[in-house]
């Protein structure tokens, strides 16, 4: 499989797998507050395409940016790093 260009990748945790071929992945990041110089945890949820329905709740996964697959899906699950079960 050849990649076209450098695509964004994120590491996150699956928080929902109830949809068919879709998983919701929560990605955490640290942001430095501009005034207080304290690091604050920020999170975002992404709907990611999971062709084989392999990802389960609690799994750590790598997601990669892709073309729009539906109204909300712009990410695919590339690899399951760590399985919860």
From Swiss-Prot:
It holds the Pfam family Ribosomal_S17. One of its GO terms (cellular component) is cytosolic small ribosomal subunit. InterPro entries: NA-bd_OB-fold, Ribosomal_uS17, Ribosomal_uS17_bact/chlr, Ribosomal_uS17_CS. One of its GO terms (molecular function) is structural constituent of ribosome. One of its GO terms (biological process) is translation. Keywords: Ribonucleoprotein, Ribosomal protein, RNA-binding, rRNA-binding. Part of the 30S ribosomal subunit. One of the primary rRNA binding proteins, it binds specifically to the 5'-end of 16S ribosomal RNA. Belongs to the universal ribosomal protein uS17 family. HAMAP family: Ribosomal_uS17_B. This is Small ribosomal subunit protein uS17. It comes from Geobacter sp. (strain M21). The gene is rpsQ.
